[in-house]
Amino acid sequence: MALDSAKKAEIVAKFARKEGDTGSPEVQIALLTARIAELTEHLKVFKKDFSSRLGLLKLVGQRKRLLKYLKNKDYTTYSKLIVELGIRDK
C-alpha cells in the first residue's frame, strides 16, 4: 500500500517548508494522510484484511501524535494544514 514516488514527490513539494524538506511535521502528516486514504479504500474492498487494518490504526496513531506536536508548536500552521488536508480538529 505504498505511495508511488511521483505522488510522494508531489505531496512533499506542496507541503515542504523549503527545497528538499521531507522531515517537517507538515510533510509527514500529509504523507500519512495520503497513505491512510489509500488504505481506507483498500479496506472498503477487502473487509477481512485485518493486518492492513492494524497497519491503518498504527498510521492514524502516528498522524495523531504528529498533529498534537504541531498544534502545540505552531498553531497557525496546524490550523492551515487541517483545513487543507480536510482533517477534523478535536
Curated annotation (Swiss-Prot):
Gene Ontology cellular-component annotations: cytosolic small ribosomal subunit
Gene3D superfamilies, alphabetized: 6.10.250.3130, S15/NS1, RNA-binding
GO molecular function: rRNA binding; structural constituent of ribosome
GO BP terms: translation
Keywords for this protein: Ribonucleoprotein, Ribosomal protein, RNA-binding, rRNA-binding
InterPro entries, A to Z: Ribosomal_uS15, Ribosomal_uS15_bac-type, uS15_NS1_RNA-bd_sf
Function: One of the primary rRNA binding proteins, it binds directly to 16S rRNA where it helps nucleate assembly of the platform of the 30S subunit by binding and bridging several RNA helices of the 16S rRNA. Forms an intersubunit bridge (bridge B4) with the 23S rRNA of the 50S subunit in the ribosome.
Family, per entry: Belongs to the universal ribosomal protein uS15 family.
Description of how the protein assembles with itself and partners: Part of the 30S ribosomal subunit. Forms a bridge to the 50S subunit in the 70S ribosome, contacting the 23S rRNA.
Protein name: Small ribosomal subunit protein uS15
Organism: Campylobacter curvus (strain 525.92)
